[in-house]
Each structure stands twice: as structure tokens, then as C-alpha cells.
């Protein structure tokens, strides 16, 4: 698995996963599951969310009470909204779960104005690892050597940032990050993936780029990027100023999370089985090795902690809605 090079396979790690406690509520392990479970991926095969499910799903099977399969189902349409809507409408029996991009789904729902699903009503199973924070970088050949240089450029003219389309979390990170840091942005948008818009900055098509730290580190280690600032509270990149040093603690709230959910109304005992299996899979030797090989941080979350996190994410991104919907 160490051959993957996508940004979703790299998360700065090193923390031990916490021990989770899930309520039993008198559940009989023999009752569920009795057949295969479909795992909805609202994106095309080969992307980061797809990779996560296809790696962790088979490991998760080992920790279910009965021997059944977890079957990935890609539903790539509407920027992810069709797959999420299908999951939302599925029968709440535990045989349909899905991976959701947060805040991507918040942003998409705000832009599309769809009422096909209510993200606050999903039955949450947990998360696939710790969320990715962001960093500001410039191409290695850029004359800018520090964050102060970037600010100085912004005082003269808007800074050109290469980004994805408005539906992407990188777009949101760039809009919110520049507002918090007082940088005047000029967005060059429409790049389809993280590699595309980062390479644009490396080529010099833009002045700078705000990308997830895993992606940033991959290019920085290759000598192609120079990191100027981290959005983490405490920078994982030596010598790089962080949110605390920049005086903007809210930067650490800009992240992309991989939530695992089920339809509204999932019975608590069934939710417990799925949540326990997911949490144990993240601590399985196979996943631990994969995470270590790819600088990943896999932190299990119980359903209540997951629901709390999604509420916090919603509140944060609602605060910045005007920048995300109108651009």
C-alpha cells in the first residue's frame, strides 16, 4: 500500500489512538449483520475517499460479529450529492453506510441549495482518521522566502492562488484562510485535483497555494515547494509558523474530515456494532502499518464524538458561508 501517492494517503501522524467505549444496550451479536454491507463512496473510483474505503473496509470485516463482506459502491454524480442522498434515503438497517466529505458536503449543499438530505440527521458511525489541516506554500523557485514576504506582496497587489472549483474544500480553505490572515486573494480556479492545483503553483501559474499538509509535505520533501505557514495550532513542520504564531487560532478549524455515516434512525445496537468494528479496524496491525508507511494519523471516534465534531464543523463553515457561496 505504500505505493499510493494521493494526498488522502498522507496525514502527519504520531499520536496514539484513544480507547473507545461504546454502549452495548443489550445487543445480541448473532442478529447483525446477516448479509453483506454496502459502503457508499460518493466519488469515482481511484480518489482518496475511495482508497480509504477499499483499504479499511476489508479490515473492518474482521471485527464484525458475523462473517459478511463490506462492498464498496461508487456513486459519482452531482459532486458527491447523489451518493449522499442515496445513503440518506436507504433503509436504516445497518446494511448501507457511506463515507462523507466534511466540509465538502456543507459547501456543496449551500451552493446547490439541495434539500435531498439533512446532514444533522445521519446516524454517525465514526471517522476514518484525523482531519487534514492546511498550509500555505510557494514554488521552490519563488522569490518569497517567508510569510512576511507573502504579506508584503499582498500589500502591493492581490496574491494569485491556484485552487480547485468552488465545490472543493481547498477552495474553502483558501477563501477562509486568506480572510483570516489579511491576504488579498486572486483565485485561479477550476483545477480538478490537489496535484493539479499544487503543480500549477510549482510551475509559477500562481504566486502561492493553500493545500492540505499531506499534499504539501509530499511536494516539499521533493524540493518542489517551500512552506511558508501552517494552519495547525502547533506546526508539525519544523521552522514554519503556525496558527498560534500567526495569531489566528481559527485556522486550525479549517480541515477536511472523512465521516462514516448511516441513514437516519439506525438502531443503537446496530450503530454500536458498526462503530466498534470501524474503531478496531483503525487499530489493526494492517492499517497501523499502512498509516505509518504513509504518515497517516488514524484516530478512532465514537458516534457521539463524531456528532459533536460535525456540529462544530457546521458552525464554523456557516460562519464563512458568504465567502463560499458567492466566492
Regions found by a protein language model. Give the residues of each.
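Short loop/turn segments at beta->alpha junctions
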Residues: 5, 79, 146, 192-193, ...
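An extracytoplasmic/periplasmic, membrane-proximal ligand-sensing/linker region
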Residues: 34-36, 179, 269-327
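N-terminal secretory signal peptides and thylakoid transit peptides that target proteins
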Residues: 1-16
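N-terminal (or domain-start) structured segment
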Residues: 27-121, 170, 180-208, 219, ...
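C-terminal lobe and pocket-closing loops
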Residues: 215-282, 315
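N-terminal signal peptide c-region/cleavage motif recognized by signal peptidases
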Residues: 23-25
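Solvent-exposed loop/turn segments at secondary-structure junctions
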Residues: 103-105, 143, 167-170, 215-216, ...
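Hinge/capping helix and adjacent helix->loop/strand transition within the periplasmic-binding protein
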Residues: 86-96, 109-196, 243-245, 257-290
